[in-house]
Amino acid sequence: VSPTPGDPDAWNAYLAEGNAKQARKRVAADVLLRDALGRVLLVNPTYKPGWDLPGGMAEANEPPEEAARRELREELDRDIDLLGLLVVDWVAPHGPWDDQIAFIFNGGTLDDDQALRPHDHELSEARFTPLEEARDLVSERMWRRLDAAVKALNDGRPMYLRDGATGW
């Protein structure tokens, strides 16, 4: 028999037990930043192969957009105003990792005087790259997400992906 809200202690314990059984998703929050030429900002992480969009993993109970802003401050020493959501991607379990939800936010266009350099040990390099060259630098999974983010930006509406693919 389930407790009722009339018994607050029993009710809260019941809800806590249910919450403990719910799925926990890892959350990634990246940002699409471009320069005046339309090139995309990529970063080269020191802890994994290949290039990536700036951003990273959310901490426990941290909203994705705040995680994106925090990561940009930590990694590139920049406070960026996010201009909206571009992509939500459900990423299937792979390797040792459970599934995750990956977000890409629109960071807008940076002025020429806003050169970005790595600010912490997690990145070795940051550079603006033409989109067609980015494909060869990022993982296939990241490429699908990045390509969708650019399409979403051009279409003016966010996209939902399932493991990097549309048409689910």
Task: Identify what each model region corresponds to.
Residues 1-30:
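Acidic, metal-coordinating catalytic segment for phosphate/diphosphate chemistry
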Residues 35-74:
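Conserved Nudix-box catalytic region and its N-terminal flanking loop in Nudix hydrolases
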Residues 49, 121-168:
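Nudix hydrolase/Nudix homology domain
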Residues 20-23, 95, 118:
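Short Gly/Pro-enriched turn/cap motifs at secondary-structure boundaries
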